[in-house]
A protein has these predicted regions:
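A helix-coil-helix interface module used to build multimeric assemblies
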Residues: 1-128
Length: 128
């Protein structure tokens, strides 16, 4: 049996789906993940710019990190979701959406051991 719009979570993804579909690029879970990646990346770069931290990120790393946001796609969203629900690349399931974004970024750092702890440093989920 196919469940139609009457079984949608809300009228927005049910009977109004044809009208709201263009918004998914900006208002979906994938869009939220992409935005969180941007916040975390720019915050990490700002931390690296502070003399008070030992964190260093060369220009190539900064560019690569910004590309994670700029070139974010469905595969990236799937990896973040997998980190959250099942675990990925040696990480156990986080069961936490923002922690999954943190781990996703750690996977893309050239020196995860020394740079990784600075991802999300001093932040709460509300900040991101």
């Amino acid at each position: 049996m196919t469940r139609g719009p009457l079984y949608a979570v809300s009228p927005l993804d049910g009977r109004y789906a044809r009208y709201t579909e263009p918004l998914t690029e900006h208002a979906s879970e994938a869009a939220l993940i992409r935005a969180r990646i941007e916040v975390e990346v720019e915050y990490l770069i700002a931390l690296a710019d502070l003399e008070a931290t030992p964190l260093t990120l060369d220009e190539s790393t900064r560019s690569d990190l910004r590309d994670l946001h700029d070139q974010f796609d469905a595969d990236d969203a799937s990896v973040v979701k997998q980190l959250e629900t099942d675990g990925y690349a040696g990480y156990s399931a986080t069961n936490h959406d923002v922690k999954a974004v943190e781990y996703f970024l750690r996977l893309h750092l050239p020196d995860e051991e020394t740079q990784g702890p600075w991802v999300h440093f001093g932040l709460t989920s509300e900040d991101v």
